[in-house]
Amino acid sequence: RIQIPVPPLEVQREIVRILDQFTTLEAELEAELEAELEARQAQYEHYRNHLLSYDSLATCGPVDMVELGSVVTLLDSRRIPLKKGDRVSGEYPYYGASGIVDYVDSYIFDEDLLLVSEDGANLKARTKPIAFSTSGRVWVNNHAHVLKVESSFYQKFLEEYLNSLDLEPYLVGSTQPKLNQSGLLSIPVPLPTEQALERSVLLLEKLKLFVTDFSAGLPAEIAARRAQYEHYRDRLLSFPEKLVSDR
């Protein structure tokens, strides 16, 4: 037998009303927090695009536009794809088109690199970054191009620049978009002065912290509100023993 409380009908109605109110407030708060995160991300992208624009870079000196292939070394020939069944779990990140997809027990690169998505719907959808930096020991499959950039500042600059760019003109394939090597290496990129490079990268890092700090605190804030709801729910559903009935 399960014992359940049977409070007066008016008490039941009031409890339901209060719990519904809590549920509504929690949903509204989550929506507001998500909207704030989206607003911060949009703000970051606005300032990023401004800082990476030709006019902004030119305030610190001359800016040359060059093909990406002239300022990076392509290391795609060293990539090795591994089927899921062939991977042995380990400590080293295994990268694909959208970033880390697994961790394996070995590595094929041990250096600072810039990876760029080679294929996948995200090349058009852009819900995730298509360029991402790695450092240290990693494994990369054949769904991400591997680029070596001599300057760490320029690598970070190129990462941000490629993520801000509309890649449609450089893609092939309609159902499965692909950024092949020739398309990637032909992308025009700015080659600014060291001063402009350092200024842009440092400002972008500060702006990114503005977004990531808030994003990191978002799950904790939502969890705290849920815990608060559960606390009051449990209190509201606690009744004296005389109101409990066997059913």
Predicted segments, located by residue:
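Charged, alpha-helix-forming regions
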Residues: 1-247
